[in-house]
Regions:
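Feature captures C-terminal
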Residues: 22-37, 86, 92-94, 100-105, ...
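Hard-cation-handling environments
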Residues: 31-116
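C-terminal motif of bacterial Sec signal peptides marking the signal peptidase cleavage site
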Residues: 16-19
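Bacterial N-terminal signal peptides that target proteins for export
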Residues: 1-9
């Protein structure tokens, strides 16, 4: 009798819970945009500012120092741009610090996430341009693979290449001509290439790098490409020189 009573009570409880449960169904979705702009600056939240202040002070002390000065606006775009030329040239420039003499350099334009405005360049500006934790990298490619690499660069409409590289590509992404320092690429020769580790792994459709040999990929904090850029800019600033670059026909899209 006692067991039957318990079973009856459990059954009643289950029915009660089932009858009280709600089954919701989504009937529609509405949304609106909340604009976050200078309107909020007129009524700052004191408590929020008090919370942020110590962190802001520390961040500003890292991001605000000036590391160089841009003589002109430097942006990144395909097939060739001032910023892409500058960063590729910096990769070649830093080779001496690693006992390297690169024949040329390649930097992916997709890794350049901002631009340098004319005037002072802060560490924070460099972080905006190069936000990823990429390291400087040196590899060797056979000439036949260099030609293949340049073909892959043509297929995406251009990447950052250093001074001395001259590519002519078609509007539909075919490599028409490739020269290095005015000479044709020797398919049998070895070429030393400066790049970043992400690109050296064959990413961004630059798969020719997967055939590279003799990789040197230092992994210290100072080997981050961002630090390499800062080092270059500080060296220029110490010499009283502004940072600048120019379009010089490294990658040309043929009219026909």
């Amino acid at each position: 009798m006692y067991k039957k009573l318990i079973l009856c009570e459990l059954a009643s409880l289950a029915m009660l819970l089932a009858s009280c449960s709600s089954h919701y169904q989504l009937t529609g979705v509405s949304r609106s945009r909340i604009l976050i702009d200078s309107t909020y600056d007129s009524r700052p939240d004191g408590r929020a500012w008090s919370f942020i202040a110590p962190y802001k002070l520390k961040v500003d002390s890292i991001m605000s120092p000036v590391v160089g000065r841009a003589a002109s606006y430097l942006n990144a775009e395909r097939p060739e741009s001032k910023l892409s030329n500058l960063l590729a040239d910096i990769l070649v420039w830093c080779g001496g610090s690693y006992g390297e003499k690169p024949d040329f350099a390649v930097y992916n334009i997709g890794g350049m996430r901002s631009a340098f405005a004319k005037g002072d360049i802060t560490y924070g500006d460099v972080l905006d341009v190069a936000p990823f934790e990429n390291k400087i990298c040196f590899v060797t490619l056979k000439g036949s693979k260099v030609i293949e690499l340049f073909g892959q660069i043509a297929s995406v409409g251009g990447e950052a290449v250093s001074h001395g590289v001259n590519l002519v590509i078609s509007k539909d992404g075919r490599l028409l001509s490739a020269k290095l320092n005015g000479k044709d690429i020797d398919p049998e020769a070895d070429y030393r290439v400066a790049t970043i580790d992400y690109v050296a792994q064959g990413n961004d459709k630059l798969e020719a790098f997967k055939s590279a040999t003799g990789m040197k990929s230092p992994s210290g904090a100072d080997d981050n490409v961002r630090q390499v850029i800062v080092k270059y800019m500080k060296a220029k600033m110490a010499q009283g020189e502004d940072i600048d670059s120019k379009i010089e026909g490294r990658i040309i899209i043929a009219d026909k």
